[in-house]
Amino acid sequence: MNHPRKDLLNISSLTDEEIHTLLDSAGPMKELFTKSVKKVPALKGKSVLTLFYEPSTRTRSSFEVAAERLSADVTNFTVSTSSVVKGESVQDTIATLQAMKVDYVIVRHYNSGLPNVIARHTCASVVNAGDGAHAHPSQALLDSFTIREVFPDVRGKRVLIVGDILHSRVARSTSLLMKRLGMEVAFLGPGSLVPRTEHSGIPRFSDFNEAFAWKPDVIYLLRVQKERQDAPFFPSAREYNKIYGVTEERLKRISGEGLYIMHPGPVNRGVEICDLAMDYERCLINRQVENGIACRMSILYHLTPQTQH
């Protein structure tokens, strides 16, 4: 990157050059995984704090492993056992972060925009690991990196995103980045979960038959986010699976057409996807996990915290 970037808060703030730098750098990072020593001293002496206000296993662990492989010191800030539960305000938390003089803060919060607030008031580099239903930039980067591995030229490739678009920060960030890289994106899901006011220009389908006729290259499944739904948006998990899930019957067609399957995790087996599909040779879910570490290493490596006095 020609100009130092302090934070990664969303995809829209990245230039095309920055996007390609982050994706291109993830390749050499991934090559480290095959070495006997999987660490480099790039961030030796730097401190990384994970600040998660929502439960997370995959994203948090991925960032922690990424930081450790760059030789950074990692501190896990567990909100349930922290002062936040005792009434500490966001302003107090920010002041604490400044006093601790950490170099990087990985933050996930249930309120959209909170990572931006922290970034404005701290010298640390802030990475948005998911804020409400707004953005999840590192997931978007790892998804596009994964697709680039199976399609060296992603331009014109078609990605069908299936499920709860309305509540999904993954759908917002991932669809935006895919379109910027020249991919075509379409949505499939219940009308109640596919917003019509957003994502202008993206085709919407109501059933898999329509979607298959669009000739997708990748089926990207989203988790049904019951915790973000104030009221039920579909009758039952069983009904959802029947209409929008990758069932064994649909897997036959997916396999026959050589389509790839992706999912940001965690997976609801029997809802979005059947057990058999998890073992399908073109299921990229485990590769997404591996690539998440490489992409997050690239993100941390390319961010530049402000000097603290």
UniProtKB/Swiss-Prot annotation:
InterPro entries: Asp/Orn_carbamoyltranf_P-bd, Asp/Orn_carbamoylTrfase, Asp/Orn_carbamoylTrfase_sf, Asp_carbamoyltransf, Asp_carbamoyltransf_Asp/Orn-bd. Its EC number is 2.1.3.2. Pfam families: OTCace (PF00185), OTCace_N (PF02729). Carbamoyl phosphate binds at residues 58-59, 108, 136, 139, 265-266. GO terms for molecular function: amino acid binding; aspartate carbamoyltransferase activity. It comes from the Bacteria. It catalyses: carbamoyl phosphate + L-aspartate = N-carbamoyl-L-aspartate + phosphate + H(+). GO terms for biological process: 'de novo' pyrimidine nucleobase biosynthetic process; 'de novo' UMP biosynthetic process; amino acid metabolic process. Keywords: Pyrimidine biosynthesis, Transferase. It is an enzyme of class 2 (transferase). Pathway: Pyrimidine metabolism; UMP biosynthesis via de novo pathway; (S)-dihydroorotate from bicarbonate: step 2/3. PROSITE patterns: CARBAMOYLTRANSFERASE. NCBIfam families: asp_carb_tr, PRK00856.1. HAMAP family: Asp_carb_tr. Heterododecamer (2C3:3R2) of six catalytic PyrB chains organized as two trimers (C3), and six regulatory PyrI chains organized as three dimers (R2). Catalyzes the condensation of carbamoyl phosphate and aspartate to form carbamoyl aspartate and inorganic phosphate, the committed step in the de novo pyrimidine nucleotide biosynthesis pathway. Belongs to the aspartate/ornithine carbamoyltransferase superfamily. ATCase family. This is Aspartate carbamoyltransferase catalytic subunit. It comes from Akkermansia muciniphila (strain ATCC BAA-835 / DSM 22959 / JCM 33894 / BCRC 81048 / CCUG 64013 / CIP 107961 / Muc).
